[in-house]
Amino acid sequence: MSQSLFCDEVLPHISDIQVYQPGKPISEVQREHNLLRISKLASNENPLGASPKAIKAVQSELINMGRYPDGNSFYLKQDLADFLQKQPTEIALGNGSNELLELVARIFAGKGDEIIYSQYAFAVYSISTQAVGATGIEVPAKEWGHDLEAMAEAITDKTKLIYLANPNNPTGTLFTQKEWEAFISKVPSNVIVVLDEAYTEYVTHDEYANGLNYLEQYPNLIVSRTFSKAYGLAALRIGYMVANEELIAYINRLRAPFNINHLAQVAAKAALKDPMFVKKTVDLNTQGMQTLTQFFEEKGLSYIPSQGNFVCVDLGPDSLKINQALLKEGVIVRPVAPEGKFSEFLRISIGLPNENQHFMAALNKILTSSNFK
């Protein structure tokens, strides 16, 4: 079919959106390169999978797949509210936190409005901005992370929404409690601030600012989190936002009916009751991060210190060629930018010890080959 058939009918701000490119699936790499062993370190997934309790809960509910889910996720909201020490009316659930990030843009911004986000930020922020016809204000990064002072200075009377991520994806950088408090105090009360904490469980920094602690003081703050990462429920697509009741009520007006499937609800409920699994996940991540960063240092490779479950390593102008060579070795990692200095980095998700070893052996082989000396 011709691509131009309906081009004139599509809204201009929609036709300009670049399609989000996820990490390559294992099956695609196996098919393309005829490989049996694959280590997927591209999508920041939990290498341990899901909690055994969550798996068991899902298995016990498979018989009910013919029924619609609870449209309000009543029991999950109750459990999540208890876990977070919030009220159920202060929580909105989404089909992945991506859905909620997009909904917030649809609720608060439109043509003529401005949405602020950082350079080197999660692609969904800019996509959501374009989708509602708003103007994206991308503030240059500082040391690969958010320049909060510059972001505060970028606020105008057209600003409706600000997206922040702490830790940031894809760079893994973190801003401190002091930096956060200085920033949020400068934001006008009519500007919505979305604080994306998808990787909060992995943080080890002593000066991390937990967004939940600021919700009462700042009614314009929305905290976004997910079950996809530390809880290992990426396949089931479930995330949540926490904010004051009024903001949550607007999100619930716009979210699709039955947006959280039944299996996701029961899995998330069970996952909340397995804190030891999350601890095991975080401990494994800490160990894996130490292993990879030590390897990079031994090889003389620069990397961005990360507070997530991934790390970006600088492989120079040949990074995309190295990425292709890694694929041929059965290792899937993630290029992070099409151009500029950041395009010389690859993002590596922390895997199981044997997956990390697979990556390091493959990269070492590539870097010592005649093609890359």
UniProtKB/Swiss-Prot annotation:
Q: What does the record list as GO biological process?
A: L-histidine biosynthetic process
The protein's required cofactors: pyridoxal 5'-phosphate
Please give the PROSITE patterns that the UniProt record associates with this protein.
AA_TRANSFER_CLASS_2
Write out the catalysed reaction: L-histidinol phosphate + 2-oxoglutarate = 3-(imidazol-4-yl)-2-oxopropyl phosphate + L-glutamate
Q: Which GO terms describe its molecular function?
A: histidinol-phosphate transaminase activity; pyridoxal phosphate binding
Instruction: Tell me which Pfam families the record gives.
Output: Aminotran_1_2
Which of UniProt's keywords are assigned here?
A: Amino-acid biosynthesis, Aminotransferase, Histidine biosynthesis, Pyridoxal phosphate, Transferase
Modification type N6-(pyridoxal phosphate)lysine: residues = 229
Q: Top EC class per UniProt? A: transferase
**Enzyme Commission number(s) of this protein:** 2.6.1.9
Q: Pathway it acts in? A: Amino-acid biosynthesis; L-histidine biosynthesis; L-histidine from 5-phospho-alpha-D-ribose 1-diphosphate: step 7/9
Self-association or partners: how does it assemble? Homodimer.
Similarity remark: Belongs to the class-II pyridoxal-phosphate-dependent aminotransferase family. Histidinol-phosphate aminotransferase subfamily.
Under what name is this protein listed?
A: Histidinol-phosphate aminotransferase 2
The species this protein was found in:
Hydrogenovibrio crunogenus (strain DSM 25203 / XCL-2)
